[in-house]
């Protein structure tokens, strides 16, 4: 998001035969269940893979808070390269951006957004920034420093609803109109502190959950 790294700089494997060179067999597919008794991983489509030892490294996915309007156009997580592309298109200088969440990863995201020259508001439901890692004093210092950089921060605050509205001249709509592109309607974001904010982009940085649904009833202790 800052622009210091091109997309190809995010690739961990630089050659097509990366796995082969390490004597690793690559199989593309979705794991459906794990049969612990017979030591097999069953894939969607019927194929099974036998194992002696099983490493579970299936990653995680962003949490989608149960907020009305969370699936509206213009609301994005910041998790994948595709997410970053979508955010780059909307987070133009002067764009009004609201970020939900001010944890460790959220602070990295907000720093990148601030460097892009957006009008940024951060909403954190905890009583301080980075609530799971910082004491109240340290979290307050971070909040004060972020505010000194021109970012609006609301702690002890939740997003209650997100509502698309008719375009009212947001910077993203203006830019899109000039270049003949399609635009995303502005969004009204209702907060628990009584404020309602109109923005061009909402970023959800409210945590992640592990991709382990396929392990249900497998006998593996999570």
Please report, for each region that a protein language model flagged, where it lies by residue:
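A Rossmann-like FAD-binding core segment of flavoenzymes
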Residues: 26-34, 38-42, 49, 115-222
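Conserved phosphate-binding and hydrolysis motifs of nucleotide-dependent enzymes
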Residues: 52, 59, 101-106, 194
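Glycine/serine-rich phosphate-binding loop and adjoining beta1-alpha1 elements at the start
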Residues: 44-89
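Residue-level detector of alpha-helix initiation sites
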Residues: 60-62, 82, 104, 129, ...
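Rossmann-like NAD(P)H-binding beta-loop-alpha module
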Residues: 86-134
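A general structural signal for well-ordered alpha-helical segments in protein cores
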Residues: 64, 84, 106, 139-143
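Nucleotide donor/acceptor-binding cores
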Residues: 53, 73, 94-96, 118, ...
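Glycine-rich flavin
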Residues: 1-24, 61-64, 83
């Amino acid at each position: 998001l800052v622009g210091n790294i091109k997309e190809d700089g995010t690739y961990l494997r630089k050659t097509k035969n990366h796995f082969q060179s390490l004597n690793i067999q690559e199989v593309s597919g979705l794991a459906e269940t794990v049969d612990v008794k017979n030591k097999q991983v069953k894939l969607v489509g019927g194929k099974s893979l036998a194992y002696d030892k099983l490493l579970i490294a299936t990653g995680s996915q962003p949490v989608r808070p149960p907020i009305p309007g969370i699936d509206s156009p213009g609301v994005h997580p910041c998790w994948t390269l595709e997410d970053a592309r979508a955010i780059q298109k909307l987070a133009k200088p002067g764009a009004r951006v609201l970020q939900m969440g001010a944890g460790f990863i959220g602070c990295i995201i907000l720093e990148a957004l601030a460097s892009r020259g957006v009008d940024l508001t951060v909403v954190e439901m905890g009583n301080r920034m980075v609530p799971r890692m910082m004491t109240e004093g340290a979290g307050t210092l971070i909040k004060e420093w972020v505010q000194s950089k021109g970012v609006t921060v609301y702690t002890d605050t939740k997003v209650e609803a997100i509502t698309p509205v008719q375009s009212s001249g947001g910077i993203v709509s203006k830019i899109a109109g000039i270049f003949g592109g399609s635009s995303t309607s502005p969004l009204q974001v209702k907060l628990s502190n009584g404020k309602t904010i109109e923005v061009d982009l909402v970023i959800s940085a409210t945590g992640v959950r592990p991709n382990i649904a396929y392990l249900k009833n497998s006998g593996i202790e999570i």
